[in-house]
Regions:
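N-terminal Rossmann-like or analogous alpha/beta NTP/dinucleotide-binding catalytic cores
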Residues: 53-136
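Phosphate/ribose-recognition catalytic cores of enzymes acting on nucleotide-derived substrates
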Residues: 12, 187-301
Length: 301
């Protein structure tokens, strides 16, 4: 997949338009709409912005840039176009359509969600886009909102679910487990002394941190998936303060310091709490491991 930080000149494209910040099942429906009959020869592309206003309102990331690129590539996208918003912010909807989508990107098919807005002051909507496409003689697919629980799927709903620890609902709206691939950093090695060696990972400042607590998780190491127990929070029993992800990979004992490891959250098991002793903590961890093995079984294949 080619990635462009400026608007390139392309030929014969089918383009999905939108925010695509989490690439949830609603975003995926828009991307899949590019697969129209008689459009197989078009190069599939996604057009968004690297710094759109929607990204600047304190909305933490639910998928890293690298993960989004991987997902789009797996979906068959050949070009990801991410110019700075300021480069086109003063274009009217009609000018954006004619100068950018047609003039530079040679769009032959456009797809968007029903709530899509474009152009200066977000004056253009999906209805206008459909009309402009008809006038130009190119295809246009406006995808209805995908519903979950009678309400449209949205990144804000996913963030709310994760903030409440409801990773199962978040996974249904994402179309995949919520996961993060972060560098393993040095910790206090308390887990190793307890017989449950753990990996510590620090969340980036702009990444969403799920509700504090203990999760059944799946951790991937060198292409192998292991059941695991992940604590997200501040480890109150041992007096830690900075929030991080600490994971015991069940059945793996290798050294992962300095490596990037993916952890996927399967199910929330219990709130983070302070135990009266290290022995009580150790017993709780082993109890958590038994639950996690059962909860993650279907995700290890």
């Amino acid at each position: 997949m080619n990635i462009y930080n400026r608007i390139p000149e392309l030929k014969s494209t089918a383009i999905a338009l939108g925010c695509f910040d989490g690439i949830h099942i609603g975003h995926q429906a828009v991307i899949k709409a590019l697969r129209q009959p008689d459009c197989e020869t078009l190069d599939q592309a996604v057009f968004s912005f690297s710094d759109a206003p929607a990204f600047k309102k304190g909305a933490e990331l639910i998928a890293s840039y690298e993960d989004k690129c991987d997902i789009l590539s797996e979906m068959g996208i050949e070009a990801l176009i991410l110019p700075a918003f300021d480069s086109v912010r003063d274009y009217s909807p009609e000018a954006f359509f004619r100068k950018i989508l047609i003039g530079k990107l040679d769009a032959r098919l456009l797809a968007c969600g029903e709530n899509y807005r474009f152009g200066k002051y977000a004056a253009g909507d999906s209805g206008m886009l459909r009309r402009l496409c008809e006038e130009q003689g190119i295809g246009c697919v406006v995808v209805p909102s995908v519903l979950y629980g009678d309400e449209p799927v949205s990144s804000s709903r996913i963030r709310a679910a994760l903030g409440a620890g409801d990773v199962q609902t978040a996974a249904k709206m994402l179309g995949r487990l919520f996961s993060y691939r972060l560098e393993v950093v040095n910790g206090r090695k308390l887990g190793r002394r307890l017989g449950t060696p753990t990996i510590n990972q620090v969340f980036p400042a702009d990444f969403l941190i799920p509700a504090y607590g203990v999760y059944a998780s799946v951790t991937e190491v060198e292409g192998v998936r292991y059941p695991s127990v992940t604590n997200i929070g501040v480890k109150p029993t041992v007096g830690a303060e900075a929030p991080l992800s600490e994971t015991w990979i069940i059945g793996y004992n290798g050294d992962l310091y300095g490596r990037f490891v993916r952890v996927s959250l399967v199910s929330f098991m219990r709130r983070e709490c302070k135990f009266p002793s290290i022995d009580a903590l150790k017993q709780a961890i082993h109890s958590d491991s038994i639950k996690s093995v059962g909860l993650t079984r279907d995700y290890l294949k």
